[in-house]
Amino acid sequence: MREVISIHIGQAGTQVGNACWELYCLEHGIQPDGQMPSDKSVGYGDDAFNTFFSETGAGKHVPRAVFLDLEPTVIDEVRTGTYRQLFHPEQLITGKEDAANNYARGHYTIGKEIVDLCLDRVRKLADQCTGLQGFLVFHSVGGGTGSGFGSLLLERLSVDYGKKSKLDFCVYPSPQVSTAVVEPYNSVLSTHSLLEHTDVAFMLDNEAIYDICKRALDIDRPTYTNLNRLVAQVISSLTTSLRFDGALNVDITEFQTNLVPYPRIHFMLCSYAPVISAEKAYHEQLTVAEITNSVFEPANMMAKCDPRHGKYMACCLMYRGDVVPKDVNASVAVIKTKRTIQFVDWCPTGFKCGINYQPPTVVPGGDLAKVQRAVCMLSNTTAIAEVFSRIDHKFDLMYAKRAFVHWYVGEGMEEGEFSEAREDLAALEKDYEEVGAESSEAGGDEEGEY
């Protein structure tokens, strides 16, 4: 079996996690108490969904997940919510004291008291796996727990499970909407460690997802639940091929192989289609060609950055539902002819496709319409550098005056860490610039000879 362990850190990670597990349970027909009426082979661990759930002798399905937060309120909602019987109580780990939006508290003072307990729980989950494939880590980089404790845990996972892939779903600060004043500090410090300790990072940003909810689903005032359910669809599409059988399955390590040209250039942009409300769905065809075109629309990107300002290096299309390879090939051929979608000249093919026959499931009473087919795109584009340069600019404005820095230094950080992290990000922006630059200078000499 190729098991995957999910780790949900802090408020953002926990709430996205709730939406994901709610959706997984619906997709597999698992009830909130963990029973699965359709699963006849009790305790027989070879079904595809066992990558995400372990089965007890009593036929209960337990998610291979850990929820961690430095303060209890958010995880207490899981402990008392609909799915309280689904999780083993040991999988929900909380501290007593908040990280207070402070990276240093999450990473040094408070984080280090709880990190060994967390790794111990992860170790227990890993011991139940026959062939652990890797980790999915969910957190935000703007808060204190997600950024500080998230980085700490990723660093420790690298030490303990060096070769296992770590895929990271990180909520980045939005351009306009801010939840904390010190977001730029936390994000820069956290990205510094994401660069080193994750294999692929998927960027999400609340503002972009708000806009999609407003525009495509006609929700006037989207709540975090609306946002998280949309994100859950994306994550579910990524992991469908691990949990169901399909025509063109995609393994976790395949994402890395196909999307990451250089180790540092591993920040992906996600988009999903069709995002459509039930009223509209009746009047639209939503063919494979249509949904393929819409995942390339800048307005459908889940992070605020415009892919037209950059070039694509690689792109992964995960289809699910009623889709055949012939339609996919035709749609991709059309995309390749479009002038607006530019690839770097050193990556001529650039598309990885996956197809899974399990149609998308929707949460009853949710906003999305039930559709026959959907596609999720993960793309590696040089435009994502916009996200970093935006955060870096805000960081510089604050750091020039050393504003708020004493809170971090007081928790045992050194000022040098700020400048080190900032330099690392400056180097990352430069890397993106160079990757997108025309490679014609290098190839200039050879062409004259032929």
From Swiss-Prot:
Subcellular location: Cytoplasm, Cytoskeleton, Spindle; Nucleus
Swiss-Prot/TrEMBL catalytic activity: GTP + H2O = GDP + phosphate + H(+)
GO biological process, one term: microtubule-based process
Modification after translation, per record: May be acetylated, giving rise to the alpha3-tubulin isoform found specifically in amoeba and flagellates.
EC number: 3.6.5.-
Keywords: Acetylation, Cytoplasm, Cytoskeleton, GTP-binding, Hydrolase, Magnesium, Metal-binding, Microtubule, Nucleotide-binding, Nucleus
GO cellular component: cytoplasm; microtubule; nucleus; spindle
Keyword Nucleotide-binding (UniProt): yes
InterPro entries: Alpha_tubulin, Tub_FtsZ_C, Tubulin, Tubulin/FtsZ-like_C, Tubulin/FtsZ_2-layer-sand-dom, Tubulin/FtsZ_GTPase_sf, Tubulin_C, Tubulin_CS
Molecular function, one GO term: hydrolase activity
Main localization category: cytoplasm
Segments of this protein annotated with the region Disordered: 430-450
Residues that coordinate or bind GTP: 11, 71, 140, 144-145, 179, 206, 228
Active site per the UniProt annotation: 254
Names of the cofactor(s): Mg(2+)
SMART domains for this protein: Tubulin, Tubulin_C
Location of N6-acetyllysine modifications: 40
Positions annotated to bind Mg(2+): 71
Purpose of the protein: Tubulin is the major constituent of microtubules, a cylinder consisting of laterally associated linear protofilaments composed of alpha- and beta-tubulin heterodimers. Microtubules grow by the addition of GTP-tubulin dimers to the microtubule end, where a stabilizing cap forms. Below the cap, tubulin dimers are in GDP-bound state, owing to GTPase activity of alpha-tubulin.
Quaternary structure note: Dimer of alpha and beta chains. A typical microtubule is a hollow water-filled tube with an outer diameter of 25 nm and an inner diameter of 15 nM. Alpha-beta heterodimers associate head-to-tail to form protofilaments running lengthwise along the microtubule wall with the beta-tubulin subunit facing the microtubule plus end conferring a structural polarity. Microtubules usually have 13 protofilaments but different protofilament numbers can be found in some organisms and specialized cells.
Family: Belongs to the tubulin family.
Protein name according to UniProt: Tubulin alpha-1A chain
Gene: ALTA
